[in-house]
Amino acid sequence: MAGHFKNFLWKWRGVAITTPAISLVVIGLRLIGALEPVELAMLDQFFRWRSPETTDSRIVIIGIDEADVRQYAWPIDDALLAQLLDKVRQQKPRAIGLDLARDKPVGTGYSQLASLFKSTPNLVGATKIADLVSSNFAITSSNIEPPPALPAEQIGAINLPVDADGRIRRGLMALGLPDGKIATSFSLQIALLYLDG
C-alpha cells in the first residue's frame, strides 16, 4: 500500500508542486492588488457586451442642460427652481429627486422654495459628505450641505466611490459616518419613496 502511494506521488509530483505554488502566487497577487487593473478591464468589457436595457417609461429625468444655463444663467434662481418643482409636483409623482446643491439661497424666491421643500414629503434633496476613506476606496471632497429647509429623512448622500483608474463603477446604498450614524444614499432614498408609493 505504501509503495502505491509513493508511486502515485512520484508520478504526480509535478502537479503536486505546481498547483499549490501557482495558487499561492495568484492569492498573493490578489492580496496586494496586482490583478485589480486586469479584473476591472474585464468587468468593463463584460458591461460593454451586455445588451442595451430598455428605458422604463415610468421614470422621467428632468435635466438642466447648456441651453437652460444660457437662457436662465447658473446657478438657477430659487424662484425659478420653485416654479419647476411645483410643476413637477402637480403631476403627482411618487418621488422627486433634486440632485442640485442648494445649501444656501440663490437669487430671489428662497421663501417659496423653502415652503415647497417643507410641503413636499416625496422630495429628496442631495448632500455630499466629505473625506470618507475606507480600505477599498477614498472619497475626498468638500461637504455640500443639504437644503436647510428639508427634513433629515428627505436627504440623501450623492457620494460615489472612484476607482484607482478614475472611473465610477459602483454606487453606495449608505455611508457610515465617523459619529456612528448612517447616511442613506440619494438613489436609495428615491427608490424607497418610489416603492413605498
Which residues are covered by each model-predicted region?
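Non-transmembrane functional regions of envelope-associated proteins
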Residues: 2-197
